[in-house]
Curated annotation (Swiss-Prot):
Belongs to the lambda phage bor family. Residues 1-16 form the signal peptide. It is a lipid-anchor. The gene is bor. This is Lipoprotein bor. A lipid is attached at residue 17 (N-palmitoyl cysteine). GO terms for cellular component: host cell plasma membrane; membrane. A lipid is attached at residue 17 (S-diacylglycerol cysteine). It comes from the Viruses.
Amino acid sequence: MKKMLLATALALLITGCAQQTFTVQNKPAAVAPKETITHHFFVSGIGQKKTVDAAKICGGAENVVKTETQQTFVNGLLGFITLGIYTPLEARVYCSQ
């Protein structure tokens, strides 16, 4: 019984996160993102669209190095608790130094 609970807990811990990184330029990026934005989606984001203007955040398209989207453990937990009704997603923008 303990092994089954441990296996289930480990499976839940490793399957809840997802991250996509889009590299725009091969310049050195800042270690910390210039801005982190949380998008609030409902029903897993079906039919919903959110955008981030990375050029505006970095002061021009030439300063954008990469963008990331990530579903963190907390975001996945919120989606699990609400049965997929509320599913937040974080977006990060990295600018050149």
